[in-house]
């Protein structure tokens, strides 16, 4: 009997093997059915509230939780000159500073009792207030949220704590070369006078008073400046009613914020060096960017992925790290600006003596993108990385609400409500000659601005095995940028050498 069963089993396995497809010799030869996915339709979730805001209401009964996010038309671009940091302070203390009826400590205690999380912040061009809590506690949570939005206390001791923490952070701005690089990147990318290049100083931080935060809040925190994203365990109609109540009868009028300034003035091509005694130099290679509505952006996105945005599949990473071992990480980014063109940046960190050589390799790869077509394999790899990962952008209801609210906030819904529906098709239509065409249009190695932060003397020596001179990579003079005082941002004067007059 046992022998008969074993024989039947062997026969079954053999027959099954004959009907199964053969296993390919390599993983990349595996074939899968085409991905069939449609992104959410924003019109299905969009609600124009009578109280002013547009809300994206996305029910999700999987867990007894609700997330409310409010996007606020505000930002550091509204900081008055001399009060840099005002927006950040206002956002940072909106929740942590208590309300008119609750001290900061009492509000924290109540939120903790509800196991709720409430947070607020204001960045460059966007404010955000969020609430996450159990659905059974939603009525009380929304009542607390309204208090925070309409009656923030900006408690004096919390303001002083924020001030001291900020001053301490400013004091450390030169401790790491990455923070120096970030500071100078803003100035080179947009110009010293552009609002995004202005940064807090000890003077501006010390000037901020509670009345300044209150005035900033009352000007911009009004329902007409809000876009709302809500997801979680609720009935749609009931949530809409709750939101109408949340934003009704606002106690102050507010103002419509002015347009975000776009008067950027990028630095002239050249090499810019900040001398910092560190063993490795940080390098950023910059070129003017594009707006997100540029019709060529799908091709630009794929081009950058092949050049340096695709990690270990990208050319810059392969040349600088894998082939030459000059950096742990190297790559590029080509973000599309919403309000003004963002900046193309290629960058890495390398030992001082190999900075020039590594920079020359990146410039070579930029030139090669424009001078010869990419391979079909490179193009298909880049396409797959975006197209196949696309559904992950919407794999939770919270993500759906958040993305759709941002589309509303930035105005894309009004211009192209079906943008995401056609996104993959636009990528898939890009051909090899499109990649080369946009590379020729946007990648100009002879016009780059190169920012280097590191030991200038060692960097300029170069490497004996690679006769590349940093100051010869661009036909423009090398400019020494001063290291700035971390508190005042004024140039630090060099210490006189021993034996010289002071």
Where are these regions (language model features)?
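M16/MPP (pitrilysin/insulinase) zinc-metallopeptidase core fold and M16-derived inactive scaffolds
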Residues: 67-132, 175, 195-199, 310-326, ...
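M16/insulysin-pitrilysin zinc metalloprotease superfamily fold
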Residues: 96-102, 131-163, 310-311, 335-394, ...
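Acidic/histidine-enriched segments that form metal/cofactor-coordinating
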Residues: 19-27, 106-216, 262, 268, ...
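Short acidic/His-enriched helical or mixed secondary-structure segments at domain edges of catalytic enzymes
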Residues: 165-184, 262-281, 318-327, 372-425, ...
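A structural supersecondary motif
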Residues: 76, 284-288, 308-350, 403
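Histidine-acidic residue clusters that define the catalytic metal-binding segment
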Residues: 27-48, 187-226, 258-263, 390, ...
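An aromatic/glycine/proline-enriched structural segment found at the starts
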Residues: 20-30, 227-291, 452-495
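Mature N-terminal segment immediately following signal peptide/propeptide cleavage
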Residues: 31-71
């Amino acid at each position: 009997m046992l022998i008969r069963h074993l024989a039947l089993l062997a026969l079954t396995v053999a027959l099954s093997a004959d009907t199964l497809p053969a296993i390919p010799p390599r993983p990349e030869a595996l074939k899968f059915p085409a991905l069939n996915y449609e992104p959410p339709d924003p019109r299905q979730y969009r609600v124009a509230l009578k109280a002013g805001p547009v809300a994206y209401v996305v029910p999700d009964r999987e867990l007894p939780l609700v997330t409310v996010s409010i996007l606020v038309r505000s930002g550091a671009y509204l900081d008055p000159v001399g009060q840099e940091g005002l927006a950040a302070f206002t956002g940072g203390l909106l929740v942590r500073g208590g309300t008119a009826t609750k001290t900061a400590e009492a509000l924290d205690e109540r939120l903790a009792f509800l196991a709720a999380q409430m947070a607020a912040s204001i960045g460059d061009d966007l404010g955000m207030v969020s609430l996450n809590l159990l659905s059974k506690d939603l009525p009380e949570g929304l009542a607390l949220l309204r208090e925070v939005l309409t009656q923030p206390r900006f408690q004096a001791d919390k303001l002083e704590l924020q001030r001291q923490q900020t001053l301490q952070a400013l004091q450390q701005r030169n401790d790491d070369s990455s923070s120096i690089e970030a500071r100078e990147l803003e100035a080179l990318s947009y110009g010293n006078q552009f609002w995004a290049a202005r940064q807090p100083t000890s003077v501006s931080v010390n000037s901020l008073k509670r009345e300044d935060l209150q005035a900033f809040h009352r000007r911009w925190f009004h329902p007409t400046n809000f876009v709302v994203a809500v997801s979680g365990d609720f009935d749609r109609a009931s949530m809409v009613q709750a939101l109408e109540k949340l934003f009704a009868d606002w106690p102050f009028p507010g103002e419509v914020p002015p347009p975000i300034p776009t008067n950027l003035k990028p630095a002239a091509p050249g090499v810019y060096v900040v001398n910092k005694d560190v063993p490795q130099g940080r390098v950023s290679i910059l070129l003017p960017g594009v707006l997100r509505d540029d019709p060529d952006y799908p091709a630009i996105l794929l081009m950058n992925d092949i050049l340096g945005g695709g990690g270990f599949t990208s050319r810059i990473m392969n040349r600088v790290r894998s082939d030459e071992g000059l950096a742990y990480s190297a790559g590029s980014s080509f973000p599309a600006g919403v309000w003004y063109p963002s900046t193309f940046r290629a960058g890495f960190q390398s030992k001082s003596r190999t900075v020039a050589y590594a920079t020359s390799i990146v410039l070579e790869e930029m030139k090669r993108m424009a001078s010869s077509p990419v391979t079909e394999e490179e193009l298909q790899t880049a396409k797959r990385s975006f197209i196949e990962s696309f559904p992950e952008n919407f794999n939770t209801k919270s993500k759906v609400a958040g993305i759709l609210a941002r589309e509303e906030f930035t105005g894309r819904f009004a211009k192209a409500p079906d943008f995401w529906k056609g996104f993959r098709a636009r990528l898939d239509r890009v051909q090899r000659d499109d990649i080369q065409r946009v590379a020729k249009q946007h990648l100009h190695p002879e016009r780059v601005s190169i920012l280097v932060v590191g030991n200038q003397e060692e960097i300029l020596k170069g490497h004996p095995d690679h006769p590349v001179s940093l100051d010869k990579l661009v036909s423009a003079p090398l400019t020494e940028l001063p290291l700035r005082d971390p508190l005042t941002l004024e140039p630090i004067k060099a210490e006189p050498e021993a034996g010289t007059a002071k």
